[in-house]
């Protein structure tokens, strides 16, 4: 399994880091088989697999449950788990307690925290406690209400400068990597060049040290629409729909199951059962 030092080395050698979300055992198993470098168990699972309206409703228990499943499917891949909404804002003591629980119960290798102001102390505290932290700046879904919706961040001078400053502060606080979401590519390059830690982009252009996308977006599974920055490499929904329709038709038509799908016992055994043929 790759470690923090491997990711730093990949940045130094200009080798792209591949990160992909996974929320359960089969998707994690497939991600590891594809040799991705990192798996993110994002709180996006709330919308993608739980059918919630936003990430705000996702709980610590949800994150632990799904991370445990992912860990079983990808034992040899570095796993980053999101700390969910308000689990690291009340106090440093509460933050440490929640983080320790997630790490101990889920098997995650690092935790991801969204935001800049108000989060730097949490990054420092977790780092001092021996918990690797991945920072997340730009479009931060847990704060989408404050940001005014799902919009590109850092397009004007003031907000771009703030992103640069916050990125440097995250690194200084001890973050081992930074996720930049929905940020202009030119700004991503500037930040990537300035930081020693790896920068992983999502909707942040090609100049980051790595890329992350949502598993379901990549394979076209259960998504009605995808953002501009997503490239779909398959349309699993179409295959699933065809398979399920065919299954329904065959059951209704009595063509499934066939004899090859059926187990049998010997006739004399059947005859000897209660209600069998009397001789």
From Swiss-Prot:
Record InterPro entries: Pantoate_hydroxy_MeTrfase, Pyrv/PenolPyrv_kinase-like_dom, Pyrv_kinase-like_dom_sf
First-level EC class: transferase
A biological process term (GO) from this entry: pantothenate biosynthetic process
GO molecular function: 3-methyl-2-oxobutanoate hydroxymethyltransferase activity; magnesium ion binding
Amino acids binding 3-methyl-2-oxobutanoate: 43-44, 82, 112
CDD domains attached to this UniProt entry: KPHMT-like
A cellular-component GO term for this protein: cytoplasm
Pathway the protein contributes to: Cofactor biosynthesis; (R)-pantothenate biosynthesis; (R)-pantoate from 3-methyl-2-oxobutanoate: step 1/2
Cofactor: Mg(2+)
This enzyme's EC code(s): 2.1.2.11
Cofactor binding comment, as recorded: Binds 1 Mg(2+) ion per subunit.
Pfam families: Pantoate_transf
Function as written in the Swiss-Prot or TrEMBL entry: Catalyzes the reversible reaction in which hydroxymethyl group from 5,10-methylenetetrahydrofolate is transferred onto alpha-ketoisovalerate to form ketopantoate.
Protein family per UniProt: Belongs to the PanB family.
Quaternary assembly: Homodecamer; pentamer of dimers.
HAMAP family: PanB (MF_00156)
Descriptive protein name: 3-methyl-2-oxobutanoate hydroxymethyltransferase
Organism: Bacillus pumilus (strain SAFR-032)
């Amino acid at each position: 399994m790759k470690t923090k030092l491997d990711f730093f080395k990949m940045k130094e050698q200009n080798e792209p880091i591949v990160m992909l979300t996974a929320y359960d055992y089969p998707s994690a198993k497939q991600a590891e088989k594809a040799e991705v470098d990192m798996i993110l168990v994002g709180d996006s699972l709330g919308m993608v697999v739980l059918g919630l309206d936003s990430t705000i409703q996702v709980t610590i228990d949800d994150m632990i449950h799904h991370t445990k499943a992912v860990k079983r499917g990808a034992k040899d891949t570095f796993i980053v788990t999101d700390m969910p909404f308000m689990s690291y804002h009340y106090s440093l003591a509460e933050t440490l307690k929640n983080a320790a629980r997630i790490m101990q119960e889920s098997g995650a290798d690092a935790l991801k925290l969204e935001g800049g102001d108000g989060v730097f102390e949490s990054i420092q505290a977790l780092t001092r406690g021996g918990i690797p932290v991945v920072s997340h700046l730009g479009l931060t879904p847990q704060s989408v209400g404050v940001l005014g919706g799902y919009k590109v961040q850092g397009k004007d001078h003031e907000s771009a400068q703030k992103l640069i400053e916050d990125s440097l502060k995250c690194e200084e606080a001890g973050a081992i990597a930074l996720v930049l979401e929905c940020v202009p590519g030119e700004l991503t390059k500037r930040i990537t060049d300035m930081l020693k830690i790896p920068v992983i982009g999502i909707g942040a252009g090609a100049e980051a040290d790595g890329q992350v996308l949502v598993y379901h977006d990549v394979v076209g599974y259960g998504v009605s629409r995808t953002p501009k920055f997503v490239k779909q490499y398959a349309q699993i929904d179409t295959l699933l729909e065809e398979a399920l329709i065919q299954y329904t038709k065959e059951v209704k038509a009595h063509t499934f199951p066939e004899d090859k799908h059926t187990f049998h016992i010997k006739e004399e055994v059947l005859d000897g059962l209660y209600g069998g043929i009397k001789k």
